[in-house]
Amino acid sequence: MSNNATTYVVSPAPLKTTSTSSKTTFHFVAGLCSGLTSSILLQPADLLKTRVQQSHKSASLLPTLKTILSSPHPIRSLWRGTLPSALRTGFGSALYFTSLNALRQGIAQTRTPLAIASASSDGKARTSSSALPKLSNWANLATGAIARVAAGFVMMPVTVLKVRYESDYYAYRSLVGAGRDIVRTEGVRGLFSGFGATAARDAPYAGLYVLFYEQLKRRLASVASSEYSEQPLKTSSSSSINFVSGGLAAGLATAITNPFDAVKTRLQLMPGKYGNMMRAVRLMIHEDGVRSLFGGLGLRITRKALSSALAWTVYEELILRAEGHWAEQGKINL
């Protein structure tokens, strides 16, 4: 009997994998859309915050608003600086959400106990208002901080142009003219004025925000769902949970980090006077008191709460719908 039987080796069928390029592109587009929406709608609040924080006498909101409304073109004045603000927030959000997703997906794939939320073994909660990975508190804190600082550095020149253009200290007639003047008088370094204070503000803010946001989402989702329910949340419930969680998380993180924002504004407006972050803090307290470190807090909380709630709700909704569509098309495995 012959032993020369032919042996056939059958290769396993290729596993379906996530289209990394398409998912990355969609996260970028979703972040861009969410950032543009919030920045355009809330530009007046951002402009008022800049005007209040630039004052040496802790100007209050109502007189500042009255001055703007009494100008020849009040509506145009309230939306002054919308273009740089939209560019900064839109592309900044796109970079931030794309980077944040990449970091979170990478950490989730490690499946280590320190990285994944204890409520789930695979990075996905049973009942959730989100399609994003569920990470531990420290992982949320770290990924939020790293992604925000990275995006902030890339968008820093636009941020400086935005602040200078919104301020009434400078008579810039165009963004191009503002950029040329900054480079001519301060060099390229002038386009990164206040980055230290910005990073010191953004790192803890973004880290705390993601931490608070994920915790609030988890708790609100558990309240909205019946105990041990396997049913997914309704779209309206998910959007409401994300919106409320985004607003509350932004309010908490903003209140904690507002002094950094006040210092950052002064550094970007008058870098020659304030020099660096520590000098700015000393001068602000000496000239205007501790209260100056909390200038514009009410406006910033209002704007941040609304912008974060809008941005994250729009972003999460787009991602949730995309994940569902891709799953139905067989492009990804959930």
From Swiss-Prot:
It comes from the Eukaryota. InterPro entries: Hem25/SLC25A38, Mitochondrial_sb/sol_carrier, Mt_carrier_dom_sf. Pfam families: Mito_carr (PF00153). It is found in: Mitochondrion inner membrane. One of its GO terms (cellular component) is mitochondrial inner membrane. The chain crosses the membrane at residues 28-53, 81-107, 141-166, 194-217, 241-267, 296-314. Its main location: mitochondrion. GO terms for biological process: glycine import into mitochondrion; heme biosynthetic process. GO terms for molecular function: glycine transmembrane transporter activity. Keywords: Membrane, Mitochondrion, Mitochondrion inner membrane, Repeat, Transmembrane, Transmembrane helix, Transport. The keyword Phosphoprotein does not apply. The keyword Nucleus does not apply. Disulfide bonds: none annotated. It is a multi-pass membrane protein. It catalyses: glycine(in) = glycine(out). Solcar repeats lie at residues 22-106, 135-219, 237-321. HAMAP family: SLC25A38. Mitochondrial glycine transporter that imports glycine into the mitochondrial matrix. Plays an important role in providing glycine for the first enzymatic step in heme biosynthesis, the condensation of glycine with succinyl-CoA to produce 5-aminolevulinate (ALA) in the mitochondrial matrix. Belongs to the mitochondrial carrier (TC 2.A.29) family. SLC25A38 subfamily. This is Mitochondrial glycine transporter. It comes from Aspergillus clavatus (strain ATCC 1007 / CBS 513.65 / DSM 816 / NCTC 3887 / NRRL 1 / QM 1276 / 107). The lineage of its organism: Eukaryota, Fungi, Dikarya, Ascomycota, Pezizomycotina.
